[in-house]
Amino acid sequence: MLNLTRTAAIGALACALSAPVLAEAPDDNPGFEKDREAILAMAGNYDVTFDFRETVPLAEGYEVKEPKLSGGYEIVRVIEDTGEFISLQHILVVGDEGEEFPIKHWRQDWTYEPSEVLTFIGGNAWEMRPVPASESEGQWAQEVYQVDDSPRYGAVGDWTHDNSVSQWTPPAEWRPLPRRDMTTRDDYDAVLAVNRHTITPFGWVHEQNNSKLVLDENPHVLVREIGVNTYRHFEDYPVEVGDDYWTATKDYWAGVRAEWEALEDAGEPFGLTMQGEPEALYQPLLELAGEVEEGTTPTQDAISEASDVIAEYTTTEIGTLSSRVNDAPEKEDGAY
């Protein structure tokens, strides 16, 4: 279990149950309800391990780095289910026994037969990419969001249920650096990733086949990496710590999501006004959630302040990919 103080954990990791909807299956996809069951099966209480290992160096002189292993307790809750849209919120429960506290983690949104999908375009910038009907038929988009509900990446793929195994695998898509590398490395700029979500008898597994990209005048792959995030059903920790946090803050986070959704819905590419680790953005938003949880700041006041923070650190004047990548700050001495 993670052993962190509340302040340290927020920095280190910023890297109400909802009843399922009985959705009517589309006439052209009898597997629709199986798809939904697989997505909803990812909700629950878990002991999670995160295992990332570089495997194949592809740039001359590059040496594979040590594996990065971590883990913790995590609850996953269905926060919205309208049939063809499902949203799952992850919340970590960390700290010593008897002193556990919650940390809002990532969110995954699932949309059936999407007309567009969130796409990372490098250098802390995103756009909504149109998805032709021929590509979205029978497919699900997964869009992933950061701890502060800012965007991370998205992709469109097919849930399959062959040989009694439910899994979703999309084509490769770009994504930002993970926080485990964002704070320590400046030798690559983006990840070309293939995801696989697989439902297992013990929970589910998120597999990643990652290629770490250098986006200079000669774009190339630095190294390949395999990631396996394993979610095992586990109840022997105070899951109510996470649930109580969500009950207290869910209206605030709904307001924050609305601010980000407005940027997506505007139809223009958008990005952050900073490159590298966006602590100046996520830290105030998490702190405002803490104030709402403690009752020291009213929810609507916190949403208004969060809106100002998001406005300060976002822009539609994103420039070129080259300019964004070159503006990324250098990491501290000793980073690799």
Residue spans of the language-model regions?
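Bacterial N-terminal signal peptides that target proteins for export
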Residues: 1-10
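N-terminal helix-cap/turn-to-beta initiation motif at the start of protein domains
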Residues: 29-45
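Short helix-loop boundary/capping segments
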Residues: 137-192, 212
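Acidic, serine/threonine-rich low-complexity disordered tracts
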Residues: 189-336
